């Protein structure tokens, strides 16, 4: 949910001629694996300054986020929710030759409320409330090939995430959620077509991609014994979207995403964003 994506975060930036802008984004959806179901709502807003360079448009800004996540495990497994708040900075460059580069760094504080169950050990850790800290660093690059009123845009993205450790206890037993590090990659391609709706311009687009864990290290210990060690995962992403430039200042976007072939998949997510430039 906290992962970055330029188009979903701020919509279509090409063609904007302004000095600054404010934007907001709402992402909601659900996902699942063999062992649990996952619902999420992510709200993000930001402000940026637009700089007109000799060969590019540069957007530099700040962002704040709030995320609500609910996890429902199978009977006798882990259940709970996470409420997160975060803040970050970003820089996006759109070059005249079609190339673009987006970078973001973000800090997130996570407040957890969970019931943990380890059936093989016959141990439960009930009503555990604790917080952790996460740091995200991401970069996305792509190139837009313009084809008349349409385009094809290959993309590549990598995100590093670091989570802090949590130490819990219940009924004389200790539960340690070790600090974790992860590196997630994404390769994909979007294709779109621009057309007019009255006085507005709209771009309908579709995308397909492959997301995978390049590196992943996380582990849960119960009384010093390893009880869980998540393995790497990968999935295919599929997207449909519509970006509308209502006028020179206002733009909105809507997209749908799902994934397949992963141990965990997004069943459906809906992303909407709005931007006002001035």
Predicted regions and their residues:
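Short coil-to-helix leader/linker segments, especially the first N-terminal amphipathic alpha-helix
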Residues: 1-8
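Membrane translocator/pore-forming domains, dominated by Gram-negative outer-membrane beta-barrels
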Residues: 7, 16-21, 25-278
